[in-house]
Amino acid sequence: MKVQEGLFLVAIFFSLACTQLVKGQHQPGENCQNKCGNITIEYPFGISSGCYYPGNESFSITCKEDRPHVLSDIEVANFNHSGQLQVLLNRSSTCYDEQGKKTEEDSSFTLENLSLSANNKLTAVGCNALSLLDTFGMQNYSTACLSLCDSPPEADGECNGRGCCRVDVSAPLDSYTFETTSGRIKHMTSFHDFSPCTYAFLVEDDKFNFSSTEDLLNLRNVMRFPVLLDWSVGNQTCEQVGSTSICGGNSTCLDSTPRNGYICRCNEGFDGNPYLSAGCQDVNECTTSSTIHRHNCSDPKTCRNKVGGFYCKCQSGYRLDTTTMSCKRKEFAWTTILLVTTIGFLVILLGVACIQQRMKHLKDTKLREQFFEQNGGGMLTQRLSGAGPSNVDVKIFTEDGMKKATNGYAESRILGQGGQGTVYKGILPDNSIVAIKKARLGDSSQVEQFINEVLVLSQINHRNVVKLLGCCLETEVPLLVYEFITNGTLFDHLHGSMIDSSLTWEHRLKIAIEVAGTLAYLHSSASIPIIHRDIKTANILLDVNLTAKVADFGASRLIPMDKEELETMVQGTLGYLDPEYYNTGLLNEKSDVYSFGVVLMELLSGQKALCFKRPQSSKHLVSYFATATKENRLDEIIGGEVMNEDNLKEIQEAARIAAECTRLMGEERPRMKEVAAKLEALRVEKTKHKWSDQYPEENEHLIGGHILSAQGETSSSIGYDSIKNVAILDIETGR
C-alpha cells in the first residue's frame, strides 16, 4: 500500500515538473541582449539562441551596425506586441538620361514565417509609370498600378493616378518571395525635366504622401520605405494550444486573424510584454503619461488606481457626475425630502392597493357564496345527501375556468338554445371538449330545474345517457358541464340541419332500441326510479357511431319506491305530452311511454310531432299516424327510403308498437321494459333472417327443420318470449 502511495506522489511530482518545463522553455534567458542600437528587442524576438521563441527563425534578430535585421537582411524599424513588425524595404526604379538611356533597379525579398500585411500599398510614382508586384509560393500572385501624365501634375498632394497611383496588396499567405518592378509604358524626352524616373515600392498605409513635382524629381534620394509584416506564434489556435501558450499572466490569447497561430495581448488596465510570464503589469491610470491608459476623471486629485482599472472618488459631501466624471455637491435637503416623500407615497399606494385587493377578494368571496346559495348550492347538497349514494362524481368548476372554456361565452361557441337555457361548446385546459349548459338570466324557475337535473343525473350511470361531468354555481346563473356529443340531435337528422344524413331503417331501429332500453333502465333499474318527462327527438343526441344519448333531465322526477305516480305541475313539450298527464296532473312512467311512442312515429315517418302545415285533424303526428294505420295508408307517411319489401313486416310491427305506446289510457300502454323487449325482438328476428338467407343449411342443421317450418302460435311465442327475457336482462344491467 505504501509503495503505491509513493508511486502516486512521484507521478504527481513529474507531472508538475513537466508542466513547469513546458512553461519555462518559452521564456528568454536572464542574460539575453535586449538592445540593438537605440531599438529595444522584445520577446518572442531575440538576438541569440535561447533568447527568442524556439522553432521559428523569423523571431531571430541579427544586430548589424547597431541596426536590427530579421531574416538576416531585412532591417527592422519597430517591434510591437500586436503581431506586426515594421521593416524597411528597398524601392525599384527605372531612370532615363537625356539621350533616353535606361537604368533599372529592382527590389526583391524573401519571407519565411512572416507574411505581407494587408495594411500596405503598392505605389507607383512617375509619368506613365508602371508598378508591378510579383509573389511566388504555392500560388503565384501579381498586382500592378499605372500612373499616367504628360505634364507635371497639380500640387494637390493626391495620389490619384496622375503622377502617382496606389493599390491594395493581398498576397497569399503561403507567398515567400516578393519582387517589385518599375517601368515606363512609353518614354518621352519631354519627361526628363520633371519625371526622369519611375518608382515602384511597397509602403505602409499613410506613410507616404505624394508631393507632385518634388517627389517626381527627388524620390531618387529615398531608397527605402516602411512596410508592415504580420507574425504569429506557432500555427495552432488558442483553443488548440490551451494552457501551453506562451501568454503570461494578466494577458489573453487571441487567434491571429490574417494567418495561422496566435498572439497575446495584455488585459484591460495592464501594459507590458504579454509574452513574458510577468510581462503585463498593472497601469496606474492616475499617474501614467500614456494617452491609451490615462484616466478620465475631470480632477486628477479624485483619481484612485485599482488593479486593472481606476475610479474617481469624491470627497465627503460630493457625488460623482458620471456624464462629466466630475464631483458635484450633494443636495441633501431636497434629495432627502424627495426620497422620503416618494417612499411614503409608495407605501401609502401599496397599502391602499392591498386594502382594495383584500376588499375585492372578500367581496368576490361573498358574491360567490351568494351565487352559490342563490343557485341552490345548499339545496343541492341537502338533496344529494338525502337521495342516497351517488353513481356519478360531480366536479365543481370555477367561474374563471368556464369563461376560458367558452371564450367568454362567445356566440360562435353556442351549440343550441332551448327552454332549459343555452348550450355552449367548451374546451377545458386538458383540451377535452365539453358541452356547457347555462340557465337563462333572471329565470328563477331554471335554478330548480338545474338542481333537479344534477340530482337526477347523479343517480344515473348508463351508456346511453349523456354523462354529467360537473357544475359551476359561483356564477350569476348556474352552469352544467356534460360530455360533448359531436353528431347533433335526432331532431337535426330527421327534420333539421342534418336531414340529408340518410338514416337507414337499421339505424332508426337501433336508436329506438337504445332509447327504449334507457327509459326502461330509468323506470325499473335505477337506484331510484326516474321519469324523464321530456322525451323528444331534440333531447336525443347522436355520436359519430349514431349511438343514442338521452339528454336534458331538467324536468325529470325521482319517484319514491313506495309510489307509482306523483302529482305535479304539468310540464313537457306539445306533441309529446301525455294527454292523461295533461288532464290529471298525475305523472307516472306511462307518460314517458307515450312520449317515446311519438319519437318512434317520427323515426318511422320522418314527420314532426306537431306540424301546423298539416290538416287540422292531422297536425298532431299521433292522430295522423293512427288515421293512416287504421285506413291502411301507412305507406303514405313512411317514405321509400325507410320502408321496402324486405322490412315491411318490421315496419308494420314497429308501427303497432308505436300505436300501443300512444294509447289515450295510460293503463293500456305497455311498460318500457316490454317496449324495449319487443323492439329488440325485431332486431334479433331481422338478424336471424339475414343469417338464414346466407346459410340455409347451417340454419336448418342448428335449429331444426321442424321449428323453422312450424307456423303455429306456440313456436313463435316461444321464440319471442326467449328474446324478450334476454332483452329485459340486458336493460336491467344498464351497463
UniProtKB/Swiss-Prot annotation:
Factors inducing expression: Induced by salicylic acid (SA) or INA, methyl jasmonate, ethylene, wounding and pathogen infection. Accumulated in roots after Aluminum exposure. Up-regulated by GRP3.
Residues annotated with Phosphotyrosine modification: 482, 581
Glycosylation sites: 38, 56, 80, 90, 113, 140, 209, 235, 250, 296
Ranges per topology, Cytoplasmic: 353-735
Result, substituting residue 101 to T: Decreases the binding to dimeric PGA. Abolishes the binding to dimeric PGA
Predominant place of localization: membrane
Binding site for ATP: 415-423, 437
Metal-binding keyword on record: no
GO CC terms in record: plant-type cell wall; plant-type vacuole; plasma membrane
Topology in the lipid bilayer: Single-pass type I membrane protein
Start and end residues of each EGF-like domain: 234-281, 282-328
Its EC number(s): 2.7.11.-
GO annotation (BP), single: defense response to fungus
Intracellular or extracellular location(s): Membrane
Domain of life: Eukaryota
Reported tissue expression: Predominantly expressed in green tissues such as stems and leaves. Detected at organ junctions.
Extracellular topological domain residue ranges: 25-331
Reactions accelerated catalytically: L-seryl-[protein] + ATP = O-phospho-L-seryl-[protein] + ADP + H(+); L-threonyl-[protein] + ATP = O-phospho-L-threonyl-[protein] + ADP + H(+)
Residues that span the membrane, as ranges: 332-352
Cited CDD domains: EGF_CA (cd00054), STKc_IRAK (cd14066)
Location of the active site: 534
Protein family (similarity comment): Belongs to the protein kinase superfamily. Ser/Thr protein kinase family.
Other information: Binding to polygalacturonic acid (PGA) multimers is calcium-dependent.
Subunit record text: Interacts with the glycine-rich proteins GRP3 and GRP3S, and the type 2C protein phosphatase KAPP. Component of a 500 kDa complex, composed of WAK1, GRP3 and KAPP. Interacts with the oxygen-evolving enhancer protein 2 (OEE2).
Its job: Serine/threonine-protein kinase that may function as a signaling receptor of extracellular matrix component. Binding to pectin may have significance in the control of cell expansion, morphogenesis and development. Required during plant's response to pathogen infection and in plant defense against heavy metal toxicity. Phosphorylates the oxygen-evolving enhancer protein 2 (OEE2) in an GRP-3-dependent manner.
UniProt-recorded name of the protein: Wall-associated receptor kinase 1
Lineage of origin: Eukaryota, Viridiplantae, Streptophyta, Embryophyta, Tracheophyta
Gene: WAK1
